Amino acid sequence: MQAGVENLVEQVVSGLGYELVDFELSPKGRLLRVFIDIERGVTVDDCATVSNQLTRVFEVENVDYDRLEVSSPGLDRPLKKLADFERFAGQEIQLRLSLPIGNQRNFVGVLQGVRESSVVLLTEKGELLAPFEEIEKARLVPKF
């Protein structure tokens, strides 16, 4: 069910001109969380627009759910796609790998971009090349 609903959400969100950052479906499928972004920043009106459109589409497609939440990804936005790592080059991120590099799985540093399907991160210890397929989790580090 999740893959089908996620594809439907992706079509609706991108059709409205937004980027689907993340999608969560609760274990029982009762709560749908949709995180959207747009270059200029997400407003409450953007969330309402996407929510209204998804509600209509879910009704037509007979998607069974109790609650729909649409929001921005926040300041600590997750980085999910290779394009995200290119877009946010120059910003500080936290990175968790599925396999350790030098007995370490968690890294913090300035994102340098992407090189040959690897994410380039400048840490205190130097440059780190993290293969994209080994990235378990990555987030922006908010600046205050």
Swiss-Prot record:
It holds the Pfam family RimP_N. It is found in: Cytoplasm. It comes from the Bacteria. Keywords: Cytoplasm, Ribosome biogenesis. Disulfide bonds: none annotated. GO terms for biological process: ribosomal small subunit assembly; translation. GO terms for cellular component: cytosol. InterPro entries: Ribosome_maturation_RimP, RimP_C, RimP_C_sf, RimP_N, RimP_N_sf. Gene3D superfamilies: Ribosome maturation factor RimP, C-terminal domain (2.30.30.180), RimP-like superfamily, N-terminal (3.30.300.70). Required for maturation of 30S ribosomal subunits. Belongs to the RimP family. This is Ribosome maturation factor RimP.
